[in-house]
């Protein structure tokens, strides 16, 4: 769901 990364924990 985050636009920049595949990791949901790291929201850019």
From Swiss-Prot:
GO CC, any one term: extracellular space
Keyword Signal: no
Tissue: Hemolymph.
Subcellular location: Secreted, Extracellular space
GO MF term (any one): oxygen carrier activity
Keywords assigned by UniProt, alphabetized: Copper, Oxygen transport, Secreted, Transport
Family statement drawn from the similarity comment of this UniProt entry: Belongs to the tyrosinase family. Hemocyanin subfamily.
Purpose of the protein: Hemocyanins are copper-containing oxygen carriers occurring freely dissolved in the hemolymph of many mollusks and arthropods.
The protein, known as: Hemocyanin subunit 1
Lineage of the organism: Eukaryota, Metazoa, Ecdysozoa, Arthropoda, Crustacea
